[in-house]
Amino acid sequence: EKYSPDAWMLNYSNPAAIVAEATRRLRPNSRIINICDMPVALENIMANILNLESRKEMIVKYYGLNHFGWWTSITDKAGKDLMPELKAFVKEKGYAKETEDYQHRAQSWKDTYLMAKDVYALDPETVPNTYLKYYLLQDEVVEHSNKEYTRANEVMDSREKEVFDTAKGIIEKGSAEGYTFAVGAHATFIVDLACALAFNTKERMLLIVPNNGAISNFDPEAMVEIPCLVGSNGPEPLAVGKIPEFQKGLMEQQVAVEKLTVDAWMEHSYLKLWQALTLSKTVPSAKIAKKILDELIEANKEYWPELS
């Protein structure tokens, strides 16, 4: 804002939904675009299922919150409806298509892709984001989780270790010769976004933006993940219209969690954070929410403000 007021900040920071809500309130005049590559990664899988060369052959309609959304329409550029074929696959196998890339995935991802079929069953009119399993299939997720070795441990022992070890090797060698990095959705998406801003391409992209009526029957202030056309003036959100009661109810509850979390940080409020955790569909009761909160405070006391 002070030194480069015309610059765009492309923000991948997690937890993306809460960070987006915080930037909306605390930095309303900054040119921040909040993004997540999860929908893009899933669209790559969808394109593979549909035997397309690229996800960019698809025109998608999608709405929701970050890690909390649904595809309502997917066509090719000629207008052919691709949803029936995709739904038939997801109904039987989720997003678990046997490919070379799939074979190299961690087991937790394979389980996640397969569980999408159970999430899909709740609304066969759409296809879901995989992360909805945490909000709709909580018992099953907990039952198959190892509290001694969580998803975070898996990431630290695999992707994070590989990246850091490679970076250390390059530094020690003084050269990147002989090293290779795979370019995935995380990298290509942010480059596509930067190019759209720089060259006014008007590319259609899924971004996290203020609703402002795009979803007509939803909180206008909520940060929603919807298609936008991106050019040199930034994102232009596309109208979604009215959404079904099932998704609306889920999203309203989750937005309340996100807003209360930001309230808690701004006000240093123990009560607001307890309320946020109690509202989360990943937490079964207020009593357990309080226990989780107290353990989170202890684990993060070096980083969190003091709550009262």
Region spans (language model):
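Rossmann-like NAD(P)(H) cofactor-binding subdomain of soluble oxidoreductases
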Residues: E1-L26, R31-D37, E43
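Long, compositionally biased stretches enriched for glycine and/or charged residues
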Residues: N48-S308
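Short, flexible loop segments at boundaries between secondary-structure elements
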Residues: P39-N51
